[in-house]
């Protein structure tokens, strides 16, 4: 009886994770400088122009950013760090279950 309860709980936890993953997408990537070195601490903003909502993350020590659990829509990504030009990429379509890899190379200049 106890084993069947544990099995049922494990199934429900697994099913909820699968459902959550299958109703959203993800965007990730690496940000580097003109020399090809990765850049930590870069602010990456995901903007939904339809709802005017923004989610922001920062790159880690490997220059990697990950934005998980994104609802399907068309988004704009904005990348900013002091001393570099801001980069904006529009028209990024996130679909159910998609995993989009979008890398950026920063250019030295004003924000």
Indicate where each model-derived feature is located.
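Periplasm-facing N-terminal accessory domains of Gram-negative outer-membrane beta-barrel systems
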Residues: 2-7, 13-111
């Amino acid at each position: 009886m106890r084993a069947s309860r544990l099995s049922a709980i494990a199934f429900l936890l697994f099913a909820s994770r699968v459902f959550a993953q299958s109703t959203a997408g993800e965007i990730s990537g690496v940000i580097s400088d003109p020399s090809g070195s990765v850049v930590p601490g870069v602010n990456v903003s995901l903007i939904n122009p339809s709802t005017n909502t923004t989610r922001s993350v920062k790159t880690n020590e490997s220059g990697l950013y990950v934005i998980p659990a994104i609802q399907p829509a068309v988004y704009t990504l904005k990348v900013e760090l002091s001393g570099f030009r801001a980069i904006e990429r529009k028209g990024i379509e996130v679909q159910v279950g998609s995993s989009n890899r979008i890398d950026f190379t920063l250019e030295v200049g004003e924000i």
